Design a protein with these regions (language model features):
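Extracellular structured ligand-interaction cores
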Residues: 14-16, 47-49, 133-137, 176-178, ...
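Terminal catalytic/cofactor-binding subdomain
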Residues: 1-123, 130-132
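Loop-rich catalytic cores of soluble enzymes, especially ATP-dependent carboxylate-amine ligases
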Residues: 110-128, 132, 141-283, 298, ...
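Histidine-centered divalent-metal-coordination microenvironment in nucleic-acid enzymes
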Residues: 18, 130-143, 285-293
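Flexible helix-coil linker/hinge segments at domain or subdomain boundaries
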Residues: 81-83, 182-197, 313-342
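C-terminal catalytic subdomain
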Residues: 299-321
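Sequence termini and other peripheral, non-core segments
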Residues: 1-44, 327, 331-381, 386, ...
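Intrinsically disordered, low-complexity tandem-repeat regions
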Residues: 378-381, 385, 390-403, 408-409, ...
Length: 438
């Protein structure tokens, strides 16, 4: 079997995680935001929502540890608040909502005053309830040596030449990765959905003893979640076209800001989300925005989850470029919403069930790493989805059936933990070493 080039696993990554603050009764905290001056604990739309932002890290384990450090830092402060202890709500879905407007928008001043106007716009257009959802964003950047390594075993990569040519080639590779990630967004939602219970007070604030909604495994990624009131179509043929296809929605008044485009994947330059900067400087990284918080993990995500996302991006980066026309884009987004349903026997656009599609996708991912020289753990990737315990739907399990261990490793063989756990061959041990996994 061919030896794997370790450069195929070189990447930089970061995590962002939103969390609502609640009091000891599990109600939304109404106290002032305690971390307004902390760059690691950002302020999002609501005063009772925190956003954890890790540094850029060189491995899945490192970024997971960075998020855990921030999580524990916040928990220590919240526990000792003078107004009474507060806690981080562990779900993507909000707790009981007593009244509309329980998540007061933050007020920003000076250079950040535009944020207040923008958030008021979101409140007026979408309502405050939508802003109660929380989730996790995964950011990943591949260096030049990765693209060179992936081109040797896959169907994509970057060419050689001057710096300008390499940048254009890298931008094209990221555009291809974004297109393929959008095509596979349904798989990410399916494997990471962890929010099957949504109290009816979300729809009718103040209603008590309402029957929880059980239709969705991930409401925030479903038709009732973070979506615009139109179906966006993007241009993946060039970076110029990609930027212009988003800006057209702001120029015609459909959106107030590019940030208002609720889409599962974003291409970004370094720093704040700025499309003109993206146009000038090129793509720095890709952001995946459709990950639910896993309530079985102390910080909302297991380290295996991050490893799997990394490996999935490696696999998708290897896929050959192909056109991504409007019709396919719309089907991809509809499939993603479909995968957010609790019933994974629902068929996607190709006529196969969500579960059948997932088994097939994971088999193809396994075969890719085997061709590249790395072999997957014993039992392979494909049986993962099919091996869920009787009566347990895979979207609910994720990597979390039975909970996780103190070091963040999930003890189960069910769900997304399986591709990177279990008994491993020498080649898989090599992959673990390249990922800096102890």
């Amino acid at each position: 079997m061919k030896r794997l080039d370790k450069n195929i696993l070189v990447a930089r990554m970061g995590l962002e995680k939103e969390s609502l603050r609640v009091d000891r009764r599990g109600r939304l905290a109404q106290t002032a935001h305690p971390f307004q001056e902390d760059v690691e604990l950002d302020v999002d739309f609501s005063g009772n929502q925190l956003e954890f932002v890790t540094d850029v890290c060189d491995s899945a384990d490192e970024v997971w540890e960075a998020l855990r450090r921030l999580h524990r830092k916040a928990a220590r402060v919240l526990e000792k608040r003078e107004t009474g202890p507060e806690y981080l709500w562990p779900f993507s879905n909000p707790p009981y909502v007593q009244a509309e407007g329980e998540n007061p928008p933050m007020e920003f001043y000076g250079e950040k005053a535009w944020k207040t106007a923008y958030r008021n716009h979101l409140r007026d257009r979408y309502g405050t309830q939508l802003m109660l959802y929380s989730g996790i964003h995964f950011n990943l950047s591949f260096p030049e040596k990765f693209w060179e390594a992936i081109s040797a075993i896959g169907d994509a990569g970057i060419g050689t030449g001057c710096a300008g040519e390499k940048r254009r080639s890298a931008d094209a590779a990221y555009l291809n990765l974004a297109a393929w990630t959008t095509r596979y967004a349904w798989l990410i939602v399916y494997l990471f959905a962890a929010s099957p219970v949504l109290d009816e007070s979300y729809f009718c604030p103040g209603k008590k003893d309402g029957t929880p909604c059980l239709k969705y495994a991930s409401p925030r990624s479903s038709e009732i979640g973070y979506w615009n009131d139109f179906e966006p179509v993007l241009d993946y043929r060039s970076l110029e076209g990609y930027v212009d296809s988003i800006l057209k929605y702001t120029k015609d008044g459909t959106l107030m800001s590019p940030a208002e485009l609720y889409y599962p994947v974003r291409l970004k330059s370094a720093g704040l989300y700025d499309l003109e900067r993206l146009r000038r400087e090129g793509v720095s990284h890709i952001e995946i925005r459709i990950i639910d918080e896993n309530p079985y993990s102390e910080i909302g995500i297991f380290r295996e989850d991050v490893r799997f996302l990394h490996l999935l991006m490696v696999y998708l980066a290897s896929r050959a470029p192909k056109p991504f026309p409007e019709g396919e884009q719309l089907l991809a987004l509809r499939d993603m919403k479909c995968a957010a349903l609790f019933d994974d026997s629902t068929c996607l656009s190709n006529g196969l069930s969500i579960r059948e599609n997932a088994v097939q996708a994971l088999q193809e991912m396994e075969e890719f790493f085997e061709r590249g020289g790395g072999s997957t753990p014993e039992g392979g990737v494909a049986p993962v989805v099919g091996s869920a315990p009787e009566g347990v739907a895979a979207p609910l399990t994720g990597s979390a059936i039975g909970g996780g261990s103190a070091n963040g490793d999930s003890p189960t063989s069910v769900g997304i933990a399986a591709p990177v756990t279990g008994s491993a061959s020498d080649e898989w041990a090599y992959i673990r070493e390249a990922l800096d996994i102890s």
